[in-house]
């Protein structure tokens, strides 16, 4: 992901020029693509689209499908694993869902006490090890026995990622355990708040983080990139509208008490939002 050279226009023209049929990109790319005027491009060659790197906001996937007629297939995996969850060919995609477990893995969502979460309950994505580690899982962290033991224990590999499972067995991402915000006794997953903000017409992309607060412990902060036509409106009135929008879209206590407008979000080379960098600046 080249922050200096990337433009959605350039990628879309490449898809048109080379008649690309299969396309994989991080959610960041799709977020910027849907801001373009699709009438300027012929993307009819696209047959199969996937995303990787981080969770995709459902509103982005739905908008892309409306514009192209192509569904985006999502999944979940780590450097330490192969594809753990996915919308495989035999699974109907649900926008925003990571899909269902890869048959080679015994995937569970667990509470901190290692008991199984109920459907709809948030917990940690874990892979049961059994007598032998499944093919595809890493063996250990190089020269880091302490870190290895921290993720391999109680008969499971612990991913450190939070999710919940719906009644049909689809998994939905909530965020890294380290990213969960504890505010006034509530546990708030950043991805749910980001999803709510992304449905507002003013927002291109956003990142939710926690900011220390002497009374609540932490408060929710939103770092927001606005669409060009809304940048002149950045101020208290728009902040209030965005806060009210989140209250309407999700539980009111999850709304961002702090909103900062920026020109761009810090990202990794693969296009993932670097929330840790935002937290460090706060």
Feature map (PLM): residue ranges:
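Active-site glycine-centered loops adjacent to acidic/histidine catalytic or metal-binding residues
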Residues: 53, 77, 99, 161, ...
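Short Gly/Pro-enriched turn/cap motifs at secondary-structure boundaries
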Residues: 96-101, 116, 151-155
């Amino acid at each position: 992901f080249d922050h200096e050279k990337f433009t959605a226009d350039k990628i879309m023209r490449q898809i048109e020029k080379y008649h690309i049929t299969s396309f994989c990109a991080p959610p960041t790319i799709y977020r910027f693509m849907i801001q373009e005027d699709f009438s300027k491009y012929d993307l009819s060659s696209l047959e199969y689209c996937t995303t990787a790197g981080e969770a995709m906001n459902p509103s982005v996937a739905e908008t892309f499908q409306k514009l192209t007629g192509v569904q985006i297939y999502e999944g979940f995996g780590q450097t330490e694993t192969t594809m753990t969850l996915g919308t495989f060919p035999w699974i109907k995609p649900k926008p925003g869902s990571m899909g269902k477990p890869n048959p080679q893995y015994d995937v569970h969502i667990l509470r901190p006490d290692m008991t199984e979460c109920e459907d709809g309950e948030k917990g940690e994505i874990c892979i049961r090890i059994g007598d032998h580690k499944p093919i595809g899982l890493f063996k250990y962290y190089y020269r880091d026995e302490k870190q290895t033991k921290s993720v391999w224990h109680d008969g499971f590999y612990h991913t450190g990622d939070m999710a919940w499972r719906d009644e049909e067995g689809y998994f939905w991402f909530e965020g890294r355990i380290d990213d969960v915000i504890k505010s006034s006794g509530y546990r708030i997953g950043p991805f749910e708040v980001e999803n709510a903000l992304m449905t507002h017409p003013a927002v291109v992309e956003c990142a939710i983080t926690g900011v220390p607060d002497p009374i609540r412990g932490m408060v929710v902060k939103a770092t927001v990139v606005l669409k060009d036509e809304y940048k002149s409106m950045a101020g208290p009135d728009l902040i209030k509208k965005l806060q009210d929008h989140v209250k309407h879209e999700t539980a009111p206590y999850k709304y961002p008490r702090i909103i900062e407008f920026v020109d761009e979000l810090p990202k990794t080379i693969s296009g993932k939002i670097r929330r840790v960098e935002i937290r460090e600046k706060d």
